[in-house]
Amino acid sequence: DDSGEISMLITCAERIHREASLRAGEDPVKLATRLYAIETESELDILSDVYTTHADALGEKGRAKYRQLAESDWEVLRDAGNSDDGTLRRRRSRVGSILEQVARAERNVDAIVIYVGDGFEYSGRYAAVATACMDIDQLDAAVEWCDRGLAVAPDNHRIHEVLVEVRLRRGEPKLALEPAWTMFERTCSPPEFERLRQSAEAAQCWKTWRKRAFDYTRKQARGSDADATRLVQLHLHEDELEEAWLAATRRGCASRLLMQLAERRETTHPAESAGVYLSHIDDVLNSNRKHRYDETVRLLSRANALLAADDERAIFEHALVQLRAQHGRKPTLMAKLDARGW
């Protein structure tokens, strides 16, 4: 259901059913038994999260019955996670989801470990347990499960993310800096730069950590096989256009970033931006893009406008001569240039 219409209808039906169940005053144990069968056996995922959404209608007795049914099923299905039977795996997943709801509702960390951790077959389970603990404000437990996860999988990005978040929630920004820096070191990306900023600003030491981040990224750009893509990204993120330009022209960077940089410098440095557009034309023409000729004309138009405004028309004329000489055997392209009077 790509349009989402069926999902909306199911959600609406669930709401109506919940309200009707509350008004009908049905025996809570019978209601729990019936709803449990629907949630665990339906192929359309109808009436999901019943333990939470129908809490009022179920009442204490109904919720107890729901929990009992799920726990009984889990004893049978516990080891079916790798079963070849898809129906069995699906039912196990749904029962586990119900027991996770119960654990969250009861703020039961031990149960969360069992049903969210689910044997910790994958390192991501540690992050999931820590997140679930954080969701129910069990922050000490969240830190503990992050630490356990990192002991097993020190490179797991998600565990580091959760640890930063929980440290900040606990009012420990200085302790959040270590995992935040670990993540930044790996990618030097704007999202991790922002995560580092959040921790450092909370610890009132952003100036120091900002310098460290740029120094580290600059050092990486000086590597023998590296270009300045990551450094340019950070400077662009910080609106430091001239620093980005210097890094890009000295060490090179990804063409998409150079194009972004040219677009943002058009007003202040029109000739340099035009030069970027003109130099990008060969890449466009040598690609397999369907509309590469139209894109070439678009780049030429932008360069022409910028150079005319900067009284550098001769540069554009020279670029046209070279383009016609190099690609004169492309009649469709030549026709498009002729149509523009070039």
Model-derived regions, located:
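Eukaryote-biased, non-catalytic alpha-solenoid scaffold regions
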Residues: 1-342
